[in-house]
Amino acid sequence: MTDYKATLNLPDTAFPMKAGLPQREPQILQRWDSIGLYQKLREIGKDRPKFVLHDGPPYANGKIHIGHALNKILKDMIVRSKTLAGFDAPYVPGWDCHGLPIEHKVEVTHGKHLSADRTRELCREYAAEQIEGQKTEFIRLGVLGDWDNPYKTMNFANEAGEIRALAEMVKQGFVFKGLKPVNWCFDCGSALAEAEVEYADKKSQTIDVAFPVADEAKLAAAFGLASLAKPAAIVIWTTTPWTIPANQALNIHPEFKYALVDTGERLLVLAEELVESCLKRYNLEGSVVASAQGSALELINFRHPFYDRLSPIYLADYVELGAGTGVVHSSPAYGEDDFVTCKRYGMVNDDILTPVQSNGVYVDSLPFFGGQFIWKANPAIVEKLSEVGALMHTETISHSYMHCWRHKTPLIYRATAQWFVGMDKQPSTGEPLRERALKAIEDTKFVPAWGQARLHAMIANRPDWCISRQRNWGVPIPFFLHKQTGDLHPRTVELMEEVAKRVEQQGIEAWFKLDAAELLGAEADQYDKIADTLDVWFDSGTTHWHVLRGSHDIGHATGPRADLYLEGSDQHRGWFHSSLLTGCAIDNHAPYRELLTHGFTVDENGRKMSKSLGNTIEPEKVNNTLGADILRLWVSATDYSGEMAVSEQILQRSADAYRRIRNTARFLLSNLSGFDPARDLLAPEDMLALDRWAVDRTLLLQRELEEHYSEYRFWNVYSKVHNFCVQELGGFYLDIIKDRQYTTGANSVARRSCQTALYHISEALVRWIAPILAFTADEIWQYLPGERNESVMLNGWYQGLSELPEGTELDRAYWDRVMAVKASVNKELENQRTAKVIGGNLQAEVTLYADEGLSADLGKLGDELRFVLITSAASVVPFAQAPAEAVATEVEGLKLQVVKSGHTKCGRCWHFRADVGSHPEHPEICGRCVDNLTGSGEVRHYA
């Protein structure tokens, strides 16, 4: 028996079937580094339109987690896709380096005895070490960027740039010093930014406290009475007993009705709607004597329960009728609303009582409770209230309360002298900051769209921004304050530039070591050099200004405005927020044109990632077991607008999808063996109809993918590429062409037409997957035939695809109908295989009973219909002649019948044909194969 295998054009490629990504990816990274890929991209892109994605800096502390990996991969996919789309898309990674977590790490390691200078030195060293570790991990993910020259908020140039940004805001009149309640952490010993506050359940002791009336006559008159028949008091409800020693006022709502309730021993003032619930809580009986509008009680004085001072009634709209009494006790030093209300009534800063120190301990001079920690003092305060007869009720509740995101300990509002950026302060020119920021939000595109309303609400309702901190490791606020007046030096902006120049050379240490006389000369004795540092959100929030326009100069020529900021949804109150405020203050516009928000990672059951639950996914482990491309494929396949589920099982499914895409690429490469595009590429008009359709379909898909990439819809890219590989290629086109590819002459038009299509598809596909499967795309690139540059990323979207000409007989709609017919035939072939009627598809002969229109369509393929259906014979018969045993299909006007062929199997093409054995020199093969071997070769027109 003759072996005809050698006469076939069998697929051949060195591209490995097994990816071996954990071993192969580091080699590809080395190659990118050796060819200077990032630098080459900058060179070829210098005359292109620019696209700037500005990196939100991760904190330089600890190993990266799955959220970091997700974020960096999303950014890389955007930068790569924009590069392929013809943009110059630089990517400068950044790190956030100052702040308490690093200072805390240094204190834990080296102790708290260190000098401030030594602390800063060690903090800088620690941050540098952490950056190197994280950088290695980010590079391992395949993220292309300027890793040799990242921006760091502790770079001298960036520290100086931040001071200059602050100077701009001072110059425009946005910065002021004020006494205001700010989020305060006793463990940090500092104010906290809004973004550093998280909420958790806390048990608190609630108290109802009676404040005896001081102005009896005024209270009686307000309720329309001649006098009060018995002692009277107003009752407040609070969850913070520790604030009672600082009480200075009582707040009621001007529009609520308040009742004077006779409880026997005394009269109580309560919100009318809450009388019943309050009396029940106090276990009292009572009746309403009179009622009055809240506004009628304004400025009536009551007495503090245990201190000899008055608490007047102030009207406030924030009072609610939920839990409580409808009366809020006001400690202006420890509540934002209280502070604003008391200031509105004329209270000056010197009158505001601030008995709680920075460590949470009452000042020693506070009667009854001096020297006690506030949380521990609560029982003593309750006991004192009971002792003086002011305690109406107490109980313990669990409620959501603000905590420090680092220490997980409860916070308080605490009025301290801090530096603020005013939200409603009138600047030297233009609108106030809040107004500017709200307008800028309207001019910004949000992905997903709901981010706009969220950020708008946050800006509309936020207080002034406290930008000062009382820490060592931070960019200084380089102000000189007059010792007598407390005013800023009149040359502050000029002096800040002098400081910035020094910081540019020596880092922030230049300020802390500076002798004031160096800058102020003889004036130095009149001024204090302040020691406050800037909020770290000011560090990262000004990077648009000192990175894009300064240290890296990657911004647009029109100014330091990025095209895109991309971070997790928590950054609406973090980096997006602080950047918006600084951008609007300095440049009167947002520092970004578009904001993209991604959700957080959860496990497959929707639970938060937690070491205690054992459901965390470590990027390093994934890289070492499955490969970074699998992680990248998971990112692309997941809709990032909500929570993103990830687990070992989910990643395994991504690995399965990866194999299908890789196998498709391998099939394409193996069937391009011996193909030289410079020599063998056919013009579109010389190609077979099916091949022209395949190239046209590829072009249509590329247009869709370009749009999905430009709109950051990566899950659609993944879905469409995967379906194209599995269904349109693997399930249709690639199956059909195998016979022609393997059995026709190596240089025949039939085979070269097919290879031309495969070449075009490969050139397009490798680019489509390049932003997602960064390593695999570059690996495929090395195996494609023809001359090419070092990396797929040095190219644009493929331009060699051609469209089916207008009026083509076998057009897109035609092949859609053929695909539907083939799907119906495949279904019946599978049924016959299951029933053991046939062994394989080529053992079958199919008869199609088609209506007139479909019959005409199928007839256009002639004898080549069998190659499309991958059966040994196929015939088309009028629908009316269908026998009873013909199978109905989902295609309208089509029935079909599959029978086992009665002919002999060809030993070369495996078709069962009547003419097998008719050629004496080749008795084992069919006439078609004989012609392909010894004659002029078969001619194909369609498939």
From Swiss-Prot:
Details of cofactor binding: Binds 1 zinc ion per subunit.
Broad class of the protein's primary localization: cytoplasm
PROSITE patterns per the UniProt record, alphabetical: AA_TRNA_LIGASE_I
Motif window: 'KMSKS' region: 608-612
NCBIfam families xrefs: ileS
Quaternary state and interactors: Monomer.
Role: Catalyzes the attachment of isoleucine to tRNA(Ile). As IleRS can inadvertently accommodate and process structurally similar amino acids such as valine, to avoid such errors it has two additional distinct tRNA(Ile)-dependent editing activities. One activity is designated as 'pretransfer' editing and involves the hydrolysis of activated Val-AMP. The other activity is designated 'posttransfer' editing and involves deacylation of mischarged Val-tRNA(Ile).
HAMAP family, sorted: Ile_tRNA_synth_type1
Recorded domain comment: IleRS has two distinct active sites: one for aminoacylation and one for editing. The misactivated valine is translocated from the active site to the editing site, which sterically excludes the correctly activated isoleucine. The single editing site contains two valyl binding pockets, one specific for each substrate (Val-AMP or Val-tRNA(Ile)).
Protein name per its UniProtKB record: Isoleucine--tRNA ligase
Primary gene name: ileS
